Amino acid sequence: MPKLRSATSTEGRNMAGARALWRATGVKDNDFGKPIIAISNSFTQFVPGHVHLKDMGQLVAGAIEEAGGIAKEFNTIAVDDGIAMGHGGMLYSLPSRELIADSVEYMVNAHCADALVCISNCDKITPGMLMAALRLNIPVIFVSGGPMEAGKTKLSDKLIKLDLVDAMVAGADDRVSDADSEQIERSACPTCGSCSGMFTANSMNCLTEALGLSLPGNGSMLATHADRRELFLEAGRRIMDLTTRYYRDDDQSALPRNIANFNAFENAMTLDIAMGGSSNTVLHLLAAAIEAEVDFSMDDIDRLSRLVPHLCKVAPSTPKYHMEDVHRAGGVMGILGELDRAGLLHNDAYHVAGSNLAEVLAKYDIAQSKDEAVHKFFSAGPAGIPTTKAFSQDCRWDSVDIDREAGCIRTREFAFSQEGGLAVLSGNVALDGCIVKTAGVEVENHTFIGSARVYESQDDAVAGILGGEVVEGDVVVIRYEGPKGGPGMQEMLYPTSYLKSRGLGTKCALITDGRFSGGTSGLSIGHVSPEAAAGGTIALVNTGDRIEIDIPARSIKLAISDVELAARRTAMEALGKDAWKPVGRVRQVSMALKAYALLATSADKGAVRDTSKLG
């Protein structure tokens, strides 16, 4: 039977000083010997997805203490990618993932916590905490802050749904009046919660359900809805159950590495492809797999992308559906249920909500469940009232959406497409692969041949797009924005938004060793590996080169001869210390970012640290 980790700091005469300090935090005599549960909360007033989390840790703590544990809360940082977008702040977003993972490890190991509750929500916070949880391998459960309600407003007497991306596009579109742009801005992000589409934050929170590490509804129940309160309370109760199973009963299935095993990672990626999730999820799943010591790679993602249909289409891939609509249609469990019936899931995978995924689906998949409480749970809807408060409303849809032919979630037979929402491309431009979110690409753009327009930074690309340099038929190439070359692998939401605002969204392509926001749509190909700074071919592309993109064939090609490509590589290497560096780019890089870049790997490895350099 495993011994409580916390006994290290609570048992024995030589721990008198530590016990004295525990007492100073409120621990009583009869508390010693109980499991200590760490609560990692990411509350901050900087981020709408986290602004409502201040009291959530203590809500969970109360449930833990009622169930016989000791709860101790600490905080991590959280970067808002939308606010950091379009300027030097974006350099810090991806590196913050590693800091979050490390900070959770530091706090949990320094204080010998026995188990962990992760209260996360936005883009890098859920992945960072996931990496830490799998690194630590102690009982864990995730509970997120939940998605924002979709924005709604009337334009030209028509009620439309909105999100952050609509505000960005309208702000850069000269055809949109100042009044309309301001109206869109004021309506786009009406409540607390993670941005309302299938962007990175919501994608990752959905994937924790598929990995088996969070409760049903975690990824889709609105932040504002009163029903979400029960998810936090149940998370507190469940972590105590997991803790008891492991430490008292020696039940190894309660540990995250045994829940999030290879089959669970396949389930998560299958869900991601089926729902057209953010391409960033590829980066984060690869990183999490490394922490879990699971051999899950780009090859596995490529294989799955050829098998899994696109069953759920959500903003930014369509203006019709947002996360509130996904929840009404049964949430993640609704999508997983259809995947299970299509024979595409490992339904024997362990899950924190039941003995295995099959058991959880039997109860929570509204297409098969007759449980009235479950149907009521998924009827939770938006109130349409701007607020920063959690649990502030109890509105419900008149009915849940079980239309699997023309609804938000479809069966395999009636899928939005038989090709999934993400694809891995490879070729001489990306020898180790790159990612495209096919869910956001028009069918006519699935094959594209164009002329390269090369930029050494996102800033230069934005200036080129807004200045009219980029024209129909161009393939915009943005390089030296990878994990090492940026450093920090910036998101390219502004370049893609500005292409849309200039009417070029379906008339140009964009490829980069950087990455894209989950809000990106259009022929946007990111994560090109190896990156330019690591000697990748993308560094050898010249303006005017022909680039051929073929999504059905999963290929991307720089159309020059092998002889010419080799000559360019030789010329680059001859530059010595100036080789594989951007030409003419002026960028202030802090010591913190330089330290990150020193160990950063390319995107095909999850942009994690290259631990081989640590000895």
UniProtKB/Swiss-Prot annotation:
It is an enzyme of class 4 (lyase). [2Fe-2S] cluster binds at C122, C195. Its cofactor is [2Fe-2S] cluster; Mg(2+). Pfam families: ILV_EDD_C (PF24877), ILVD_EDD_N (PF00920). Coiled coil: none annotated. Its EC number is 4.2.1.9. GO terms for cellular component: cytosol. One of its GO terms (biological process) is isoleucine biosynthetic process. The keyword Iron applies. Mg(2+) binds at D81, D123, K124, E491. Pathway: Amino-acid biosynthesis; L-isoleucine biosynthesis; L-isoleucine from 2-oxobutanoate: step 3/4; Amino-acid biosynthesis; L-valine biosynthesis; L-valine from pyruvate: step 3/4. Signal peptide: none annotated. It catalyses: (2R)-2,3-dihydroxy-3-methylbutanoate = 3-methyl-2-oxobutanoate + H2O; (2R,3R)-2,3-dihydroxy-3-methylpentanoate = (S)-3-methyl-2-oxopentanoate + H2O. The active site is at S517 (proton acceptor). PROSITE patterns: ILVD_EDD_1, ILVD_EDD_2. One of its GO terms (molecular function) is magnesium ion binding. Binds 1 [2Fe-2S] cluster per subunit. This cluster acts as a Lewis acid cofactor. Keywords: 2Fe-2S, Amino-acid biosynthesis, Branched-chain amino acid biosynthesis, Iron, Iron-sulfur, Lyase, Magnesium, Metal-binding. InterPro entries: Dihydro-acid_dehy_C (IPR042096), DihydroxyA_deHydtase (IPR004404), DiOHA_6PGluconate_deHydtase_CS (IPR020558), ILV_EDD_C (IPR056740), ILV_EDD_N (IPR000581), IlvD/EDD_N (IPR037237). The modification N6-carboxylysine is found at K124. Homodimer. PANTHER family: D-XYLONATE DEHYDRATASE, D-XYLONATE DEHYDRATASE YAGF-RELATED. Belongs to the IlvD/Edd family. Functions in the biosynthesis of branched-chain amino acids. Catalyzes the dehydration of (2R,3R)-2,3-dihydroxy-3-methylpentanoate (2,3-dihydroxy-3-methylvalerate) into 2-oxo-3-methylpentanoate (2-oxo-3-methylvalerate) and of (2R)-2,3-dihydroxy-3-methylbutanoate (2,3-dihydroxyisovalerate) into 2-oxo-3-methylbutanoate (2-oxoisovalerate), the penultimate precursor to L-isoleucine and L-valine, respectively. This is Dihydroxy-acid dehydratase. It comes from Shewanella piezotolerans (strain WP3 / JCM 13877). The lineage of its organism: Bacteria, Pseudomonadati, Pseudomonadota, Gammaproteobacteria, Alteromonadales.
